[in-house]
């Protein structure tokens, strides 16, 4: 789940 959000970073 975090990996998807980190993609925006």
Curated annotation (Swiss-Prot):
Keyword vocabulary terms for this entry: Amidation, Neuropeptide
Top-level lineage group: Eukaryota
Sites of Tryptophan amide modification: 9
Free-text tissue specificity from the UniProt record: Neurons located in two ventral cell clusters in the subesophageal ganglion.
UniProt GO BP: neuropeptide signaling pathway
Job description of the protein: Suppresses spontaneous contractions of the hindgut and oviduct.
The protein, known as: Locustamyoinhibiting peptide
Organism: Locusta migratoria (Migratory locust)
């Amino acid at each position: 789940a975090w990996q998807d959000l980190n993609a925006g970073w």
